[in-house]
Amino acid sequence: MNQPLQHTTVLLDEAVHALLGDGDAPAGTFVDGTFGRGGHSRLILQRLGPQGRLVAFDKDTEAIQAAARITDARFSIRHQGFSHLGELPAASVSGVLLDLGVSSPQIDDPQRGFSFRFDGPLDMRMDTTRGQSVAEWLADAEAAQIAEVIRDYGEERFAGPIAKAIVARRTERGPISSTAELADIVAGAVKTREPGQNPATRTFQALRIFINAELEELQQALEGSLRVLRPGGRLVVISFHSLEDRIVKQFIAQHSKEVYDRRAPFAPPQPMRLKALERIKPSTDEVAANARARSAVMRVAERTEVPA
């Protein structure tokens, strides 16, 4: 039987250094947008000054339970997705950290339904207290809808055949309720396999992203960060696949240049609101020690003096 993996935080030191800067014991309010199991939050608290404050967000009830064990008065957590960080007071935050990866305890718990490696209920919700599970959505979705999700969020070229196979199995045997059943359907529909990759990888990724509205939440969080970051505040984002990184890259690029209004060619341009600082990949040593770091990309930007 596969044993659950202990979660190892990716780019831990690099992310916290980028967030807090070089100063000793910084003050100010910082945001950890994805508490997970607290890897980043605990290190931030170690390096934060006595007047500092850390606000964490997470949708996962198990993460909220883990956070309850932190008794530091400088720390608080909200049972919300990071898309809500824009509700914090404007220009009140010195740094925002978004780690977009799914934690190992989530992936490796069969009852959460995130992985094709373990047979369990086909759920995949980050917050199991609300919303549809993947099984519930697949029970009613049309083939065209399923194909669109798998193609757009998984970049899967066999999205059409996979969707047809899902609907055919559902029609023949009833709703698809387990991860093993879905993985078996996908394996039968994918005609060629990428070396070293399970044929269900892209489909599971796509359904997880869709059911949790991950890309929409990311866009909202990035927009919210512009509102809450004070001038000089840092935005640090760790992404794990090309769809996420593309959104982050484009967002930083969009706000790192002056914007002219074509309808008013003589009006002064809107000044840039972010300054791109770094793009960091895990070291070869980190990837060797933690295979899940392989696809990680960290981008760092700094809020300019211009108000939101």
Swiss-Prot record:
It catalyses: cytidine(1402) in 16S rRNA + S-adenosyl-L-methionine = N(4)-methylcytidine(1402) in 16S rRNA + S-adenosyl-L-homocysteine + H(+). GO terms for cellular component: cytoplasm. Pfam families: Methyltransf_5. InterPro entries: RsmH, SAM-dep_MeTrfase_MraW_recog, SAM-dependent_MTases_sf. Keywords: Cytoplasm, Methyltransferase, rRNA processing, S-adenosyl-L-methionine, Transferase. S-adenosyl-L-methionine binds at residues 38-40, 58, 82, 99, 106. GO terms for molecular function: rRNA (cytosine-N4-)-methyltransferase activity. This is Ribosomal RNA small subunit methyltransferase H. The gene is rsmH.
